[in-house]
């Protein structure tokens, strides 16, 4: 069997796609390649994982300037033709579109070549590329039940995350209250600024508070200076290499609400305060966060309302109430999907097999 995974751009698209690819390769013996763009994180992550990456030239259509949209419209036919060439050379049995720049043209090319397609949509509201190809996809794998209204043949599989998030070591009983803060791999200035401003009040209000703070590369030195007080217990770094360990120690997490982060929160069963990125396409981060808030697993602070006072109030309320934290943790655990990669891979294999059987009839 041969499969193409198409799309990328951000870690939220690429990291789950790699988990699906590994499952297809290791469990189903599939030969797998990726279609992406030069501008996405897939150029680094996909080859590093041992998979071939084919590149097409296409940009964004949604939430971009008029000139960028016009340029993308001109690039789109060429990207479809290039994707069709890749498909004809590789001869896949199925294509999985994971959203992002390359997903739309590649999935349209698959339609032209009569290759069956599966959509993977990690966000509660589908991205533009997945909405574009939804009418002809054979199946869709999603994270939230609400997302199914946008697709035919939809299955709630969850988002693949590393198994380590499901198998966290027991939190040690050391009397500390541990707060984990991060804004994604690049950090988040709004979150950094609010935390720095809130530090004196947080440490005064919460005895034994310990903060682990991922700042992002650009703001590390500025943020780290705020933690220089020898009485402040903290670990500050531009990037956390062992995020499962950081999750294991955390009583509460403050973070954005991209699809992968939300999936990791549920896998680790950690209470969270989400601060959605307001510029995210289709406001999907807010919608992701609201799904967990509605389930009782998280709190939400809009970035427009984020300040030191609001942050201190929310953090103190939660860290001062173990019953609330335990309830949020239990609610998050109910939303987790430990077998997501296996379910999506099995779905793709089933779609490919069904098409082959139909062709023989």
UniProtKB/Swiss-Prot annotation:
EC numbers listed for it are 2.4.1.227
Gene3D superfamilies from the UniProt entry:
Glycogen Phosphorylase B
Q: Which domain of life is it from?
A: Bacteria
Q: In which pathway does it act?
A: Cell wall biogenesis; peptidoglycan biosynthesis
Annotated GO biological processes are: carbohydrate metabolic process; cell division; cell wall organization; lipid glycosylation; peptidoglycan biosynthetic process; regulation of cell shape
Question: Which amino acids does the record list as binding UDP-N-acetyl-alpha-D-glucosamine?
Answer: 10-12, 123, 162, 185, 240, 285
Where does the UniProt annotation locate this protein? Cell inner membrane
Supply the Pfam families for this chain.
Glyco_tran_28_C (PF04101), Glyco_transf_28 (PF03033)
Task: Kindly give the InterPro entries that the UniProt entry links to this protein.
Answer: GlcNAc_MurG, Glyco_trans_28_C, GlycoTrans_28_N
- Membrane topology, as annotated: Peripheral membrane protein
Select a single GO molecular function from the record's annotations and give it: UDP-N-acetyl-D-glucosamine:N-acetylmuramoyl-L-alanyl-D-glutamyl-meso-2,6-diaminopimelyl-D-alanyl-D-alanine-diphosphoundecaprenol 4-beta-N-acetylglucosaminlytransferase activity
> Which GO terms of the cellular component aspect does the record hold?
plasma membrane
The catalysed reaction is:
di-trans,octa-cis-undecaprenyl diphospho-N-acetyl-alpha-D-muramoyl-L-alanyl-D-glutamyl-meso-2,6-diaminopimeloyl-D-alanyl-D-alanine + UDP-N-acetyl-alpha-D-glucosamine = di-trans,octa-cis-undecaprenyl diphospho-[N-acetyl-alpha-D-glucosaminyl-(1->4)]-N-acetyl-alpha-D-muramoyl-L-alanyl-D-glutamyl-meso-2,6-diaminopimeloyl-D-alanyl-D-alanine + UDP + H(+)
Q: Which UniProt keywords apply?
A: Cell cycle, Cell division, Cell inner membrane, Cell membrane, Cell shape, Cell wall biogenesis/degradation, Glycosyltransferase, Membrane, Peptidoglycan synthesis, Transferase
Q: Which NCBIfam families match?
A: murG (TIGR01133)
As for family, the record states: Belongs to the glycosyltransferase 28 family. MurG subfamily.
Q: What does this protein do?
A: Cell wall formation. Catalyzes the transfer of a GlcNAc subunit on undecaprenyl-pyrophosphoryl-MurNAc-pentapeptide (lipid intermediate I) to form undecaprenyl-pyrophosphoryl-MurNAc-(pentapeptide)GlcNAc (lipid intermediate II).
**Under which name does UniProt file this protein?**
UDP-N-acetylglucosamine--N-acetylmuramyl-(pentapeptide) pyrophosphoryl-undecaprenol N-acetylglucosamine transferase
Task: Give the species this sequence originates from.
Answer: Koribacter versatilis (strain Ellin345)
């Amino acid at each position: 069997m041969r499969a193409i995974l198409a799309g990328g751009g951000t870690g939220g698209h690429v990291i789950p796609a790699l988990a699906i690819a590994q499952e297809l390769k290791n469990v189903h013996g599939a030969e797998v390649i990726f279609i992406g763009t030069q501008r996405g994180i897939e150029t680094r992550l996909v080859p590093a994982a041992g998979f071939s990456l084919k590149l097409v030239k296409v940009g964004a259509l949604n939430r971009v300037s008029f000139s960028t949209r016009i340029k993308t419209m001109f690039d789109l036919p060429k990207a479809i033709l290039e994707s069709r060439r890749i498909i004809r050379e590789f001869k896949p049995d199925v294509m999985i579109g994971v959203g992002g720049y390359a997903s739309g043209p590649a999935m349209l090319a698959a339609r032209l070549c009569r290759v069956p397609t599966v959509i993977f949509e990690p966000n509660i509201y589908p991205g533009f590329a997945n909405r574009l190809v939804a009418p002809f996809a054979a199946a869709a794998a999603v994270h939230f039940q609400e997302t199914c209204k946008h697709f035919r043949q939809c299955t709630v599989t969850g988002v693949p995350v590393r198994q380590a998030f499901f198998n966290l070591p027991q939190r040690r009983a050391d009397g500390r209250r541990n707060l984990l803060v991060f804004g994604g791999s690049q950090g988040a200035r709004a979150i950094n600024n609010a935390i720095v401003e809130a530090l004196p009040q947080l440490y005064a209000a919460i005895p034994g508070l310990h903060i682990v703070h991922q700042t992002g590369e650009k703001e590390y030195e500025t943020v780290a200076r705020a933690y220089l007080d020898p009485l402040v217990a903290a670990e500050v770094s531009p990037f956390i290499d062992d995020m499962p360990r950081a999750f294991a120690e955390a009583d509460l997490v403050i973070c954005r609400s991209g699809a992968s982060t939300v999936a990791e929160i549920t896998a680790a069963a950690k209470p969270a305060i989400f601060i959605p990125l307001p510029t995210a396409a289709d406001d999907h981060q807010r919608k992701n966060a609201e799904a967990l808030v509605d389930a009782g697993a998280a709190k939400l602070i809009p970035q427009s309302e984020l300040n030191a006072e609001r942050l201190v109030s929310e953090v103190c309320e939660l860290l001062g109430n173990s019953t609330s934290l335990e309830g949020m943790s239990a609610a998050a655990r109910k939303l987790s999907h430990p077998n997501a990669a296996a379910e999506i891979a099995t779905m793709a294999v089933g779609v490919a097999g069904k098409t082959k059987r139909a062709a023989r009839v």
